[in-house]
Amino acid sequence: MSVLLIPNRGKDAGLSVTRHTAALLRRQGISVLMPDEFAGDFTSRDGITFLSLDRAVGVAEQVLTIGGDGTLLRAGIFCAEHDRPVLGINLGRTGFLATCEVAELDTKLARLAAGDYTLTTRSLLEAIVPSRNWRAIAMNDVVLFGRTRIHPMDYKLICDGTFVSRYRSDGLIAATPTGSTAYSFSAGGPVLDASAPVMVLTPVCAHSVHAVPVVFGADRHITIVAEQENRDTVYACADSGPQCELAPGESLHITTSPKKLRLITFDPAEQLSAIESKLIRR
């Protein structure tokens, strides 16, 4: 069995947790791989094999991210592309996705080695702006916003070719069930069951008392049009990644991606219990 470690230098000072994790995995008889950019931080005594990220994820059977939810988010799309399950070791604040705490490493890595875990499947969104030849995959959300983010813009929402509503708001968020606990939640959107085959569209600071979040089935094709009334450019981004401009009249198309992300979990009820412990009591 082989595991790829993807650490976040900004979260793991001196890569101490990464080094400890590698030692625990090797003690369980698991081969440890890491991207070759980290080769200079270790010695041959650490027993780690360094490869390019593409080669490493092709060889590894599982991926462990070491950082926080953001670290897992950035690695998640890459892992989904290669159909590799992921476990997040949490060094961040929330740990809603990265559910393994450092204090639990001994126990949970032993369970990982023994195959005592389950895999949960998370849906992804695919966003396309045809007029710009732009395509992105999102694990959390696809967000539309104006240049300054504080001035309202006008959007038209269409589902499967049928007009649904118009929004005048600072932005619009299309979120997966996973992303429903992130930006969409902060904007007043509902928390969705992670296994539900749905997506939610949530307006940000809408200039209407009637503008509410709308939940769509995962098989729907959502089109959002930057209205001609807009005097400025609208921007789209997926999971806070590279942005795409939309001039007035241009459209963003959102569907559920055929690719899925598999998360390693040791408790199938983790997401439900985290609502209380990490969202409400935080």
Predicted regions and their residues:
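ATP/NTP phosphate-donor binding region
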Residues: M1-Q62, A103-T118, V129-A136
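ATP/nucleoside-binding phosphotransfer catalytic cores, i.e., glycine-rich phosphate-binding loops
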Residues: S131, A136, L144, R149, ...
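Short glycine-rich anion-binding loops that position phosphate/pyrophosphate groups of nucleotides
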Residues: G10, D69-T71, T94, T178-S180
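Short glycine/serine/threonine-rich phosphate/pyrophosphate-binding segments
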Residues: G14-L15, G70-A75, T181-S186
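Catalytic core of DAGKc-family lipid kinases
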Residues: R93-D170
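Gly/Ser/Thr-rich active-site loops/lids in small-molecule metabolic enzymes
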Residues: P152, T162, R166-H210
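N-terminal glycine-rich "phosphate-gripper" loop used for MgATP/nucleotide binding
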Residues: E61, T65-D69, G76-F78
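Proline-centered loop/turn at the N-terminus of a beta-strand
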Residues: S31, D83-P85
